[in-house]
Amino acid sequence: MVTSTKIHRQHDSMGAVCKSYYQLTKPRIIPLLLITTAASMWIASEGRVDLPKLLITLLGGTLAAASAQTLNCIYDQDIDYEMLRTRARPIPAGKVQPRHALIFALALGVLSFALLATFVNVLSGCLALSGIVFYMLVYTHWLKRHTAQNIVIGGAAGSIPPLVGWAAVTGDLSWTPWVLFALIFLWTPPHFWALALMIKDDYAQVNVPMLPVIAGEEKTVSQIWYYSLLVVPFSLLLVYPLHQLGILYLAIAIILGGQFLVKAWQLKQAPGDRDLARGLFKFSIFYLMLLCLAMVIDSLPVTHQLVAQMGTLLLG
């Protein structure tokens, strides 16, 4: 427990204490995870999502992601201190003690599992818990500091939210959530390596073997291009052969996918261009958000009715 003396010495107020713990969770990362969870739930429920279940599932997912990110901050406190970009994070800055952060992280994880298992179902709780364990043990502990393919395998942790969302609605896992899992798994390397190209000097400084540091920029942008080529066709599997989504999603997925490929190709032609890397990184976020929004809209019954009416008018 943080004593009043320690609070007074390290923070100006209780609000500042809460802010430090909030920052431990890396809150900017969480919304994208929740968007993929929500999209999966909408598809699974065929556009008739149960609002209370949706909110509970998203809250459980938020707690799980916050737990995983806090554990990551604890483990990486040594390299966070060495990098100027991360030195101001709560633990290296001395605002939160590691043992207090650990208690906080474990409490978040337990609360996430309890909430999902009690009010949704056990499978969704177990999947959320597996995401925490995988992110911490496999990615943060085992892969991140030992292999240039860290983000490829480690990306599985960030691909779990659609499984949680689907399980929350159906209580099981069919082919569709695994396609969503694969889509995000393939999307992660282009997204993260574009960022790594911009901050590769930071990683080199602390001996973290990110691909741009180990293999260089040209090899990295080639890998980005290859993974991007896989992302687009995988996004279309939801239309055929799975028949989960229709023509509206198909049109949006093709347009977004085409732009994704254009940006990846432009970066491939100019590996050292940080602006192009930044552009791809930002667009990759935009891409996934809009793709998930298209999934939600396409799954709605009213969308099916409108598309059917338009088809009748065109054919009639």
Curated annotation (Swiss-Prot):
PROSITE patterns: UBIA. The lineage of its organism: Bacteria, Bacillati, Cyanobacteriota, Cyanophyceae, Synechococcales. Disulfide bonds: none annotated. It comes from Synechocystis sp. (strain ATCC 27184 / PCC 6803 / Kazusa). This is Protoheme IX farnesyltransferase. The chain crosses the membrane at residues 29-49, 54-74, 102-122, 123-143, 151-171, 179-199, 224-241, 245-267, 283-303. Its EC number is 2.5.1.141. It comes from the Bacteria. Belongs to the UbiA prenyltransferase family. Protoheme IX farnesyltransferase subfamily. GO terms for biological process: heme biosynthetic process; heme O biosynthetic process.
